[in-house]
From Swiss-Prot:
Job description of the protein: Putative mitochondrial ATPase. Plays a role in mitochondrial morphology and mitochondrial protein metabolism. Promotes degradation of excess nuclear-encoded complex IV subunits (COX4I1, COX5A and COX6A1) and normal activity of complexes III and IV of the respiratory chain. Mediates mitochondrial translocation of TP53 and its transcription-independent apoptosis in response to genotoxic stress.
EC number: 3.6.-.-
Alphabetical keyword list: ATP-binding, Hydrolase, Membrane, Mitochondrion, Nucleotide-binding
Encoding gene per record: Afg1l
Predominant cellular place of this UniProt entry's protein: mitochondrion
Species for this entry: Mus musculus (Mouse)
Enzymatic class: hydrolase
Name by which UniProt lists this protein: AFG1-like ATPase
Positions of ATP binding: 136-143, 209-214
Classification via InterPro entries: ATPase_AFG1-like, P-loop_NTPase
Gene Ontology terms, MF aspect: ATP binding; ATP hydrolysis activity
Family: Belongs to the AFG1 ATPase family.
Gene Ontology cellular-component annotations: mitochondrial membrane; mitochondrion
NCBIfam families per the UniProt record, alphabetical: ZapE (NF040713)
Assembly notes: Found in several complexes of 140-500 kDa. Interacts with YME1L1. Interacts with COX4I1. Interacts with COX5A. Interacts with TP53; mediates mitochondrial translocation of TP53 in response to genotoxic stress such as mitomycin C treatment.
Length: 480
């Protein structure tokens, strides 16, 4: 199977063609070529690969970054080039991580998983190098260094996916595999069947290198299978590189039945070296020119009329009529009430009050370069589900450089309201009852929204960057 598509890899190839006068023509505008859509029967997780590979980094790049992709030969070379070009400033924490990624990139040259069974893999001379787990606060450059690594790594089969999307597909694969088993006859007990090993084998046949963005565990269904799944992947020879906001020891912290999850941490650390990237600087919040006012408070006078006017101005540049839009998402219909060309005008209720997920937001990101989001509420723990959807929405929009105009009930920095609860909510009690857990065994801090708060720090950082002129220009697909 061919390596997954990535814009940075595409830009690298196109940039070299641009400088040499081959391929796209000397001086030609470099454009990101869209990947083929996943066809019928292809695993869903390949769609998530497209999601993250397609939108992982800017769809527009500065001349210095294009030149770096054309002339550099590895992540460290690329990093040094951007320092000299004053595109980046020296950061010893970033450099240390890039140096480790450079070594791994060199170790992976020509690496592939041996064909055959587990026995042949165990005794293969082509031993896999250890992967890397890079963690640190939001905005410290984890995604950027992953971009550099992924653009230059030379292995036949590599994939870059959001961890959440990857696990969604694993569960779908498990479901499909179980559905394909012969039905048991009446009166006979069905034999227990463990689908994890064959699923891991299937994934191992598709890729030798798995790169994960946003490695975080919040779902008990994920937590219970991670050890077995990754143990099989590692034994099959899959190399893992991951970025996360948390050190391995803090994954699924205070989660339900965490004792069953803890062994996974040892497996992860056995096969991946752990690196901290935490310079104490959120580069997304650095001083950048604003793109004009893009974030409005609903308490401001005539805010609806102002946002209406902004939509009208954007719509006038589209060769289309304003009307409802229906998108097809995995056989379902996603209806939007108001859109014009590549501009959508949505309410928070449309996007986050309905049962939508990552695949829906992926489709939005592919179809629109500008989205208005009206009436975003201030999030409390009572709106936990909506907060999770909003986080996923912004993650997708950020990955695809989708430009946003917002009206909200609170400033970005105050959008998430952390509340201390003296007693567990009705929803928490119901969940505990369903799992047969007492208050003591459940660890009530699981229900304090700790994971959501952590993820929201990333969202606030991204929302801040999305207000800048640089981001707005990079997201203009009409320029490409």
């Amino acid at each position: 199977m061919a390596a997954s598509w990535s814009p940075l890899v595409t830009l690298r190839s196109a940039a070299r063609s641009r400088l040499t006068g081959r391929g796209v023509g000397c001086g030609a505008r470099v454009v990101a070529i869209p990947p083929p859509a996943p066809g019928p029967g292809k695993p869903l997780w390949k769609a998530y690969t497209v999601q993250t590979s397609e939108g992982v980094r800017p769809t527009a790049a500065s001349e210095a970054r294009l030149k770096a992709l054309a002339v550099c030969h590895g992540p460290l070379d690329h990093y040094d080039f951007l320092i000299k070009s004053q595109e980046l400033r020296e950061d010893e924490h970033q450099r240390r991580v890039v140096q480790c990624l450079q070594k791994l990139q060199e170790d992976l040259k020509g690496y592939s998983i041996e064909e055959g069974g587990l026995f042949s893999k165990l005794f293969s001379r082509n031993k896999p190098p250890k992967g890397l787990y890079v963690y640190g606060d939001v905005g410290t450059g984890k995604t950027m260094v992953m971009d550099m690594f992924y653009a230059y790594v030379e292995t036949k089969r590599k994939k870059r996916v959001h961890f959440h999307g990857f696990m969604l597909d694993v569960h779908r694969r498990i479901h499909h595999l179980k559905q394909s088993l012969p039905k048991r006859k009446a009166g006979f007990m069905a034999k227990s069947y463990d689908p994890i090993a064959p699923i891991a084998e299937e994934i191992s046949q598709e890729t030798s290198l798995l790169c994960f963005d946003e490695f975080q565990v919040t779902d008990i269904a994920d937590a219970m299978i991670l050890k077995q799944l990754f143990e099989n992947l590692f034994k099959n020879g899959v190399v893992v590189v991951a970025t996360s906001n948390r050190p391995p020891e803090d994954l699924y912290k205070n989660g339900l039945q965490r004792a069953n999850f803890v062994p996974f941490i040892a497996v992860l650390k056995e096969y991946c070296d752990t690196l901290q990237l935490d310079s104490g600087v959120d580069y997304r919040k650095r001083e950048l020119a604003p793109a004009g006012k893009l974030y409005y408070l609903t308490s401001e006078a005539d805010v609806e009329a102002v946002v209406d006017k902004l939509f009208d101005e954007l719509a006038q540049k589209q060769n289309d009529l304003t009307s409802p839009r229906i998108l097809k998402v995995q056989g379902r219909e996603l209806r939007l009430n108001k859109a014009c060309g590549s501009v959508a005008d949505c309410t928070f209720e449309e996007l986050c009050e309905r049962p939508l997920g990552a695949s829906d937001y992926l489709e939005l990101s592919k179809n629109f370069d500008t989205v208005i989001i009206r009436n975003i509420p201030q999030f409390s723990l009572a709106k936990r589900t909506q907060a999770r959807r909003f986080i996923t929405l912004i993650d997708n929009f950020y990955d695809f450089k989708v430009r946003i105009i917002c009206s909200a009930s609170a400033p970005i920095s105050s959008l998430f309201l952390h509340q201390h609860q003296d007693s567990e909510s009705d929803q928490s009690r119901i969940l505990m009852d369903d799992l047969g857990l007492s208050q003591d065994s459940a660890g009530l801090s699981m229900f304090t929204g700790e994971e959501e708060i952590f993820a929201f720090q990333r969202t606030i950082s991204r929302l801040t960057e999305m207000q800048t002129e640089q981001y707005w220009i990079e997201g203009d697909r009409s320029r490409k």
